[in-house]
């Protein structure tokens, strides 16, 4: 496993304050950077729909599991802050045969994205799964099981992408151990 100077040692099983388990949250459109600029799509959730403990977490990269659930709703076109129109399909294109509805591993950022000069906190969840379509408007329930590293600023997009890839590698290895896999069941309740 690649280890960087900024990585925090990850225990063999989650310890306080983990696990943190959310209720179902709305998946909303973000800035469109995860997919288009970085090649790393994220499911963005409103911070105000999360448990208060999430707001108290140190800014940085975390890992856990998530379950996406479609919502019965008509398709909508929603305008983002940048003026781009995004289709909200509420998860109507999620495919059970593709594994889209299973509990899936995630890497998530709780932060302000200093590379993009944000001055407000966001929670962006990268689900480690190959979805065939977007699912804005669907619901997501997720847990946070541990902390990888603090939020960093970057001098280049390439350096940011490389660190995200390392975050994914570390998270996959940890989440593939039984003490962490045992927490998948929390999302089925």
UniProtKB/Swiss-Prot annotation:
It is an enzyme of class 2 (transferase). Pathway: Cofactor biosynthesis; FMN biosynthesis; FMN from riboflavin (ATP route): step 1/1. Keywords: ATP-binding, Flavoprotein, FMN, Kinase, Magnesium, Metal-binding, Nucleotide-binding, Transferase, Zinc. Zinc or magnesium. It comes from the Eukaryota. GO terms for biological process: FMN biosynthetic process; riboflavin biosynthetic process. Its EC number is 2.7.1.26. InterPro entries: Riboflavin_kinase, Riboflavin_kinase_bac/euk, Riboflavin_kinase_dom_sf. It catalyses: riboflavin + ATP = FMN + ADP + H(+). SUPFAM superfamilies: Riboflavin kinase-like. This is Riboflavin kinase. It comes from Candida glabrata (strain ATCC 2001 / BCRC 20586 / JCM 3761 / NBRC 0622 / NRRL Y-65 / CBS 138).
């Amino acid at each position: 496993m690649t280890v960087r100077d900024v990585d925090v040692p990850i225990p063999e099983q989650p310890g306080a304050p983990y696990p943190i388990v959310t209720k179902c949250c709305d998946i909303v459109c973000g800035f469109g950077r995860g997919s288009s600029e970085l090649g790393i799509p994220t499911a963005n959730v409103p911070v105000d729909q999360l448990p208060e403990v999430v707001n108290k977490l140190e800014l940085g990269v975390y890992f856990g599991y998530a379950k996406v659930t479609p919502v019965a709703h008509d398709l909508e076109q929603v305008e983002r802050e940048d003026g781009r129109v995004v289709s909200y399909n509420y998860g109507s294109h999620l495919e059970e045969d593709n594994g889209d509805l299973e509990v899936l591993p995630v890497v998530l950022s709780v932060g302000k994205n200093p590379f993009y000069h944000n001055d407000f906190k966001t929670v962006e969840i990268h689900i480690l799964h190959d979805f065939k379509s977007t699912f804005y408007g669907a619901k997501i329930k997720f847990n946070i099981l541990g902390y990888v590293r603090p939020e960093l600023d970057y001098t280049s997009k390439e350096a940011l992408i490389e660190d995200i890839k390392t975050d994914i590698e570390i998270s996959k290895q940890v989440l593939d151990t039984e003490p962490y896999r045992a927490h998948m069941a929390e999302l089925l309740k």
